[in-house]
Amino acid sequence: MNFHEYQSKQLLAEYGIPVPSGKVAATPDEAVDVATSLGKGPWMVKAQIHAGGRGKAGGVKFCKTTDDVKAAAAKMLGTKMSTYQTAGVELPINLVLVTTAGEIVKELYLSILVDRGTKTITYIASSEGGVEIEQVAAETPELIHALNVDFVEGVQGYHGRDFGFKLGLNAKQAGQFASIMVNLYKLFNEKDLALVEINPLAILDDGNLYALDGKFDSDDNAAFRQKQLVAMRDKTQEDETEVTASELDINYVTMDGNIGCMVNGAGLAMATMDVIKLNGGEPANFLDVGGGANKQRVIEAFKLILSSDKVEGIFVNIFGGIVRCDMIAEGIIAAVKEVGVKVPVVVRLEGTNVEEGKQLLRDSGMAIIPADNINDGAKKVVEAVKNAA
């Protein structure tokens, strides 16, 4: 789950990490009220969407007067914005964040994440903030510093001070940096986060460090115990079909192709998409119907796939381990009847009760194309889509 900047800053502030004063507004007049309450300008007005790159897209404005604040908010609110991170998708701007705007002396980068390679929680820091860390890694890798945290010791103040000195901070700032690192570690663990990125972590003209922007990713598997984070979810920023899928507890990701996929198991689902690509097709989605799939779940999965008008064919690839192939077959037959599937459907079944499942499909009288294996199924669905065009 992703979060808006204002939500990220709220969490940072709760854990003692300094952020500029600010508040969100839903109308231009509210934006002016917020600016006035913050005191004398200047201010920043920032569009709240689930994406970076807002500045280049016109979503971050420096304002010297309340008239500027009102104009900036009016230009953003109620519109949609795409950035280099949204892959052409336009996201609605329902809120703007109005904050104080201090003069930036220096921009740093700081993040904390799970490093699967070292199996540790890892900090990444750089003296080059305000730009994409991938760009820094490619052009000046010597400016990036990493710290793998020992699970027993945790992160200590001396880790942060050492990091701070490597970034060129003075003694006072290095102490602040250490405090931020320690608090960030606590936030990361207590909220079950997968990533926290502060970019930039800036030194302002008062000589102190502030988190000017924050990006959070949470571990959805821990959502059951993170009610505060779940309440922050903004479904208007998400793909509508993916939201529906999450409510049904189906793992679904929209893709750009025209061949819908229904598979059980994430690994098999990814392999299925790969084999479709190898056979000249383009998957329209990732869909893991889950090991505990039942008839109704299969029907809902078909509805999700066919909610996209781009889908011109469907490949159902099921390995019956926990789930039974005959039950999947019953779900496919019911789905084709209920949803009114008008595109070619290729089905590959293997595993528990496979013969019973195949017999049900044969006896259904429906134009369902059987496949012997994953490659055969991919070839058949690609061919069927071409022939139907």
Swiss-Prot record:
Comment on bound cofactor: Binds 1 Mg(2+) ion per subunit.
Record's catalysed reaction(s): succinate + ATP + CoA = succinyl-CoA + ADP + phosphate; GTP + succinate + CoA = succinyl-CoA + GDP + phosphate
Coiled-coil regions, chain positions: none
Keyword line: ATP-binding, Ligase, Magnesium, Metal-binding, Nucleotide-binding, Tricarboxylic acid cycle
Residues binding substrate: N264, G321, I322, V323
GO function terms (MF aspect): ATP binding; magnesium ion binding; succinate-CoA ligase (ADP-forming) activity; succinate-CoA ligase (GDP-forming) activity
UniProt-annotated binding residues for ATP: K46, G53, R54, G55, G102, E107
Xref: InterPro entries: ATP-grasp (IPR011761), ATP-grasp_succ-CoA_synth-type (IPR013650), ATP_grasp_subdomain_1 (IPR013815), Succ-CoA_synthase_bsu_CS (IPR017866), SUCC_ACL_C (IPR005811), Succ_CoA_ligase-like_bsu (IPR005809), Succinyl-CoA_synth-like (IPR016102)
Cellular component per GO, a single term: succinate-CoA ligase complex
Pathway assigned in UniProt: Carbohydrate metabolism; tricarboxylic acid cycle; succinate from succinyl-CoA (ligase route): step 1/1
Keyword NADP: no
E.C. number: 6.2.1.5
Domain ATP-grasp: 9-244
Binding site for Mg(2+): N199, D213
SUPFAM superfamilies: Glutathione synthetase ATP-binding domain-like (SSF56059), Succinyl-CoA synthetase domains (SSF52210)
Cross-referenced Gene3D superfamilies: ATP-grasp fold, A domain, ATP-grasp fold, B domain, Succinyl-CoA synthetase domains
GO biological process: one example: succinyl-CoA metabolic process
Cofactor(s), names only, from the UniProt record: Mg(2+)
Family indicated by similarity: Belongs to the succinate/malate CoA ligase beta subunit family.
PANTHER family with a match to the protein in the record: SUCCINATE--COA LIGASE [GDP-FORMING] SUBUNIT BETA, MITOCHONDRIAL, SUCCINYL-COA SYNTHETASE BETA CHAIN
Quaternary data: Heterotetramer of two alpha and two beta subunits.
Function: Succinyl-CoA synthetase functions in the citric acid cycle (TCA), coupling the hydrolysis of succinyl-CoA to the synthesis of either ATP or GTP and thus represents the only step of substrate-level phosphorylation in the TCA. The beta subunit provides nucleotide specificity of the enzyme and binds the substrate succinate, while the binding sites for coenzyme A and phosphate are found in the alpha subunit.
Name the record gives this protein: Succinate--CoA ligase [ADP-forming] subunit beta
Organism: Xanthomonas oryzae pv. oryzae (strain KACC10331 / KXO85)
